[in-house]
A protein has these predicted regions:
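Acidic/histidine-rich catalytic neighborhood of metal-dependent amide-processing enzymes
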Residues: 96-138
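Acidic/His- and Gly-rich active-site-bordering loop/insert found
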Residues: 1-110, 114
């Protein structure tokens, strides 16, 4: 079972890596690959949308309710290049840690968990595009 101190280290590692590859909205290709590679490593299923968005689900034993967790993915353009200045690197890292914790304890899970890594939170509006694609209906 994943221990809290190990989880903290994993989240910090994710944040450091994701901070170093900040990308603008709808062009989060390195970021998306990093997340997909990690989800593959921990054997969590997902689908991709809009080239960079990632949506996955961990099924609970009962599964009559579904709880969703979302993280933004994009950085901001600055005079020094693209940077994570709004904490999106932290949001993604925390969500990856939560996914791993839930996945490691899924035998205790009654409800379904959906996770959404949403591109273009800062613009041009990745959430609206994902909703139009029907991710909230699945």
């Amino acid at each position: 079972m994943l221990q809290i101190e190990n989880l903290r280290k994993i989240i910090y590692k994710h944040r450091k890596e994701l901070h170093s590859i900040a990308e603008i909205g709808l062009k989060e290709f390195k970021t998306s690959k990093y997340i997909r590679d990690y989800l593959d490593k921990i054997n969590v299923n997902y689908n991709t949308y809009l080239d960079t968005a990632i949506v996955g689900k961990i099924n609970g034993k009962i599964g009559t309710k579904t709880i969703a967790f979302r993280s933004d993915m994009d950085g901001l353009v600055t005079d020094e290049g693209v940077k994570h200045l709004c904490g999106h690197d932290g949001h993604m890292s925390i969500l990856l840690g939560l996914i791993e914790l839930i996945n490691d304890n899924k035998e205790l899970l009654n409800d379904n968990i959906v996770f959404i890594f949403q591109p273009a939170e800062e613009g041009p509006g990745g959430a609206n595009e994902l909703i139009k694609l029907g991710i909230m209906e699945e």
